[in-house]
Amino acid sequence: MKKRVVITGLGAVTPIGNNVQTMWENMMKGTNGIGMISLFDASQSKVKIAAEVKQLDASKYLDERTAGKLDRVIVLGIMAASEAYEDAKLSPNAVDPYRFGTFVTSGIGGLNSIWSESQTAVARGADRVSPHFITNAIINLVGGNISMRFKAKGPNLPVVTACSASTNSIGEAFRYIRDGYLDVAFAGGSESSINALGIAGFAVMRALHSGDNPAKASMPFDKKRSGFVMGEGAGVLILEEYEHAVARGAKIYAELIGYGSTSDAFHVTAPDETAEGISKCMELALQDAKLKPTDIDYINAHGTSTPLNDRIETLGIKKVFGPHAYQLNVSSTKGMTGHMLGATGAVESIACVLSLINQVVPPTITTTELSPECDLNYTLGTPVKRPVNYALNINLGFGGQNAALIFKR
């Protein structure tokens, strides 16, 4: 028999708050976390704005020496996982370590280390790179460091699917628990790629917004949208088998009841114009959850503020939800957080969970004039109080990746 899977812990480090409570408070205020780049000298870059984590202080969880050896993407991941672990009130005796998994991923991994060590290799010779280079660069060491820290000896399986990576990782952790292989799992993602190489790589693809006004930079579904704003951060959820959570007296935030994943098999960066893969992904999640389209109250959209994504994602929502697409609330929180790439799905899943708890939909803050083909209720400007019993989070990624999760109050 399939097991029930619930969320018992949340952790986040984001451009609008370095813990879950602060992030949510700022989300409800419509705080814009986008600003001028400070993590590197962007004076010669075509792109000068990003959504950075501010006043990063890892000292609550990591001593200065340890943090100094780790790539920023790993530090962010450890911080979010630590908050989630504490929030869930887990302890070494609370779970069988071999039934405790880690599904914490990244879209790109340790790009800060890749960039800095490549500069060292060019300037001083390849044999002068740091001995920590490889372990800081590879994606599985985000989750690997978390599993070592908390003695989670079950599978460490980061699903790497670009900007849907953490959504897929949460979905696969869900399946492992639902099918009886695990009792508890860290699930989510971390990203920190705001450096000269990361910004340039996306900029030359014309994927990034290149203006210099943070208030008008990330404008999902807006007529004037022109590209995404790179963000950084981490989000981790504790997924737990329901009976296991009840037995230890854990508080339960919400239940995860559906997961869908597809590939467009169409193009390396562009979504399929027909929205077939996007819509099928949501349909699979609904089937998995045993819900009708009319059951969904809120969709946290991928909503990147790129011309293609927002138009095609809107089409996909209409194809699945029909007339109900105009009755439910949709929003993109990327106007506040920027696009956190492989971490975005985890942070947006946390937003869905908090929406269920608080019965409120977070806003799309920067959008003022909707594009004609984007005509849904995108919750513009301010949060909306409404009944939210089922929330769907969808994320898309380069390579035609599509992933959707459904959470139940």
Q: Could you describe each region identified by the protein language model?
A:
Residues 123-130, 171, 175, 191-247, ...:
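Glycine-/small-residue-rich "gating" segment that lines the acyl/pantetheine channel
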